[in-house]
């Protein structure tokens, strides 16, 4: 059995995703998810050889620990637990403290927890998952890989807000950016597509999913990105509003809304869901648009317009542009979304290759623009592979 297996864990407040990655092939030996933590129907499901299995968790305790325990049992049943050499954890927010992958110890756990003010929905849940994994795999080295780390190369003009420097000095208020592992991975894969060294390339990476962000990447490094202090800013998303005049927050507070109500509205009831009035799922919005639903049509138009606008604005961060990269669940699979974004960029010479664009879906990538026109391409992301590779590299450092 391979000695290159890394267990990758992404622990959220009410869920826990996991995958067993072979760092040589990049393939997931198995993957699954624990869902509905804190509810009566909490469960863990996984796929092996294309077949889905499910296990109901009990309602009498810590669902993160129960999920990890079930994963351990699953690995033992498959006879592969002993072949795992490390555990890698996704961490949403590393602030300015963590600029690269680190080995997890008690000090690191405390520092991640101390950053919870910057990611209150994510970092505490990461620590819960890490502690459960450490208890389950005490002999294995475990590593934290940060979404924000890739963006620590942004220049001050890109990450600094036009506010008093005291707010940055006292509270660390600045642009941090997210989806870093995804932007990192697809930019390296895109450089291979155009046969150019990553150190001499320039891309605009467009990660579109329920969460979405754009990143300008110069010579392999992030130089600007659309998400900011939190993952709420930037593009319109599944349930998040994206960029919004902050004066609206004061307006709603004066109208009697509580702070919690305002931010629940902006985080959970906006985006595709809020504008369409139907769903946060892009596929459902497009289906309704095709049936003539006005709210769905407007949601589609706002989303694609804002993505194109961000892409255009990030051209000024680069000396040249080798390609636009579409990735993430929507970016990899939604033909109508990509088509409309490219139409919006026609002033820059982008022309869709309809056959190639239709073909680049469901795990298949490639260039989707016509020959002799600026390049746009689809690159399926693989964040788990990045986390596994980063963990393996540090293990052998």
Swiss-Prot record:
Mg(2+). Can also accept Mn(2+). ATP binds at residues 17, 207-211, 281-283, 329-333. It comes from the Bacteria. PANTHER family: ACETATE KINASE. This is Acetate kinase 2. GO terms for biological process: acetate metabolic process; acetyl-CoA biosynthetic process. Its cofactor is Mg(2+); Mn(2+). Pathway: Metabolic intermediate biosynthesis; acetyl-CoA biosynthesis; acetyl-CoA from acetate: step 1/2. One of its GO terms (molecular function) is magnesium ion binding. CDD domains: ASKHA_NBD_AcK_PK. Substrate binds at residue 90. It comes from Photobacterium profundum (strain SS9). The gene is ackA2. It holds the Pfam family Acetate_kinase. Catalyzes the formation of acetyl phosphate from acetate and ATP. Can also catalyze the reverse reaction. Gene3D superfamilies: 3.30.420.40. Its main location: cytoplasm. Its EC number is 2.7.2.1. NCBIfam families: ackA, PRK12440.1. The keyword Kinase applies. Mg(2+) binds at residues 10, 383. Keywords: ATP-binding, Cytoplasm, Kinase, Magnesium, Metal-binding, Nucleotide-binding, Transferase. HAMAP family: Acetate_kinase.
């Amino acid at each position: 059995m391979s000695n290159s297996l890394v267990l990758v864990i992404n622990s959220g407040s009410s869920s826990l995703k996991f995958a067993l990655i072979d760092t040589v092939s990049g393939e997931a030996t198995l993957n699954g998810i624990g869902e509905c933590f804190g509810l009566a129907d909490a469960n863990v499901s996984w796929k092996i050889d294309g077949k889905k299995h499910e296990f109901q968790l009990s309602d009498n305790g810590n669902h993160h620990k129960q999920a990890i325990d079930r994963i351990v049992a699953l690995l033992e049943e498959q006879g592969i637990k002993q072949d795992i050499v490390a555990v890698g954890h996704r961490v949403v927010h590393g602030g300015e403290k963590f600029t690269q992958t680190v080995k997890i110890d008690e000090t690191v756990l405390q520092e991640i927890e101390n950053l919870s003010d910057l990611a209150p929905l994510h970092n505490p849940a990461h620590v819960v998952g890490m502690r459960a994994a450490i208890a389950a795999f005490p002999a294995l080295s475990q590593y934290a890989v940060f979404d924000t780390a890739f963006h620590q190369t942004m220049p001050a003009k890109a990450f600094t807000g036009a506010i008093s420097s005291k707010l940055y000095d006292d509270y660390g208020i600045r642009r941090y950016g997210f989806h870093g592992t995804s932007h990192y991975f697809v930019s390296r894969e895109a450089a291979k597509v155009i046969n150019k060294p990553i150190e001499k390339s320039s891309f605009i990476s467009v990660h579109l999913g329920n969460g979405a962000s754009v990143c300008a990447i110069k010579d392999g490094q992030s130089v600007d990105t659309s998400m900011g202090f939190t993952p709420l800013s930037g593009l319109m998303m599944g349930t998040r509003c994206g960029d919004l005049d902050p004066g609206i927050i004061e307006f709603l507070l004066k109208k009697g809304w509580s702070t919690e109500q305002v931010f629940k509205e902006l985080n959970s009831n906006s985006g595709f869901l809020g504008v369409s009035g139907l769903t946060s799922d892009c596929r459902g919005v497009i289906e309704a648009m095709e049936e003539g639903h006005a709210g769905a049509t407007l949601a589609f138009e706002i989303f694609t317009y804002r993505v194109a606008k961000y892409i255009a604005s990030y051209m000024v961060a680069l000396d040249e542009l080798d390609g636009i990269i579409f990735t993430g669940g929507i970016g990899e699979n939604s033909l109508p979304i990509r088509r409309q974004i490219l139409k919006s960029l026609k002033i820059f010479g982008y022309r869709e290759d309809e056959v190639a664009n239709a073909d680049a879906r469901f795990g298949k990538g490639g260039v989707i623009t016509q020959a002799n026109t600026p390049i746009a391409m689809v690159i399926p992301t693989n964040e788990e592979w990045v986390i596994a590779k980063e963990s393996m590299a540090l293990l052998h450092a």
